[in-house]
């Protein structure tokens, strides 16, 4: 059984806040490798700037994840009318709001690319935008396990997957402990 792991970092950050604990990415890799050949592991993250979360991203890479990033979109707090004309002041810059970086396309491209040499996908996300991707992967014969948190996963996505695992049920296996940065597997 060949397995691929895909982690929507934005979705999982909020899911972990909801359950009240954070998982250790290394423990997740180890769990995903049990009973299967873990052929790829992807982590998707939005960034405020290119240096944002650099140590964390480096640690993920050292563990064996392929890390994909996109900049967060920034919106002005005043509706953007002045900033659209090039006028800005300190009040506006203090009211900046960052919104989600949409990495759904990257997730889809990666999973469709590895699909021909994969039997199973573990997807950690709650995004409704991925439901059609999951349907297509299942139509290609892949088994899809969705891991997320009750109340933070779109019904359409959950219904599209073969199996749903509530993140809270994995706490004994995944909860963050002491940092370890040895690779769990080698990317091929």
Regions from the PLM with identified roles:
Residues 1-188:
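Terminal and domain-boundary accessory regions
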């Amino acid at each position: 059984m060949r397995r691929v792991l895909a982690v929507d970092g934005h979705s999982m950050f909020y899911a972990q806040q909801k359950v009240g604990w954070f998982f250790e990415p290394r423990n997740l890799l180890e769990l995903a490798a049990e009973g299967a050949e873990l052929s790829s592991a992807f982590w998707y993250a939005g960034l405020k700037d290119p240096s944002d979360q650099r140590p964390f991203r480096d640690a993920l890479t050292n563990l064996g994840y392929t890390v994909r990033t996109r900049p967060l979109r920034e919106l002005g707090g005043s509706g953007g009318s002045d900033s659209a004309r090039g006028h800005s002041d300190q009040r506006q810059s203090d009211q900046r709001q960052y919104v989600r970086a949409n990495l759904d396309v990257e997730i889809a491209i990666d999973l469709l690319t590895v699909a021909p040499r994969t039997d199973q996908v573990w997807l950690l996300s709650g995004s409704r935008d991925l439901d059609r991707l999951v349907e297509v992967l299942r139509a290609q014969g892949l088994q899809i396990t969705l891991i997320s948190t009750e109340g933070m996963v779109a019904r359409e996505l959950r219904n599209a997957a073969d199996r749903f695992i509530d993140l809270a049920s994995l706490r004994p296996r995944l909860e963050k402990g002491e940092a370890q940065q040895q690779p769990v597997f080698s990317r091929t």
